[in-house]
């Protein structure tokens, strides 16, 4: 723990967590949150998080550092429109895009045949409830982020309570309405009362709920590092992986349910773009160990483990994670003092897209709310359009 952390920890333990029977003082002292904001007027991300925790936040979207640590990309709608909207009509046609048809289809999220501002709107956070998400969590019985045919059929059997062999519209509406009850075997859900303030403060300073550092900014050089692969056979240096293709850098850990839930999306991205981009994951500190902010949703799928105390223990957990999620790209294990995860602000989960020159072209928001594979894919597609040579036109 650095000096800043120790200072804040002292403030917290000497004020907020004082015993209830402490005799009243004649003059009220300033609240810890007021002291923090006065001491750090620039209000860095970790201060925003600590202040909100002290004020009773349960770390929902838009609270703490989540309102500051939003995604950054070169490929905003304004930047993309300025580059590709040749006729100035406020949209980008297939002809104006002049790239791969499959890439255009990926960017055209509303399937209207044009690229427009709504296609670039990823403002809903990654855990925003939807019928599709509810169906996914109901089906993903083992919590590995992928729904198998057997799991999908299991949902049908569970919902067909009358044994009629079919489901009605109302059956599905009741099961997967955002306001109605539905089965959630693997969905991320804290205890009904929520974590205590002390649990959240410990999680903050242990860097379990996130790094105290903000990480590199857009267009900055990606900090170099060298880590061992999860099997211990190779040492991989980031700078050796940079160029000629874009590099997708993934941070995550096993006890982060939202990270696990995105495993299928991550694997599909890798399968689709593995010939055009390099994928590397860094395994970081556990977000929800049993000796920290434990989650009942982890218990339901058998992901129960304490925070690793040694590098070897972290490697063992990382191997379980890779085996369960079945990732087919290099997975590196961060040092036990979180040297890479802290520098990149990678805990509990985060994406970076690094261009062939080694600079950050896209940086996701902090996980879990900012951990959006589809948003990453959009920036990847547009970076590929810039970095790949155009296909030669076919002569008639």
Task: Describe each PLM feature range.
Residues 250-256:
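Aromatic-flanked redox-active Cys/Sec active sites in thiol-based oxidoreductases
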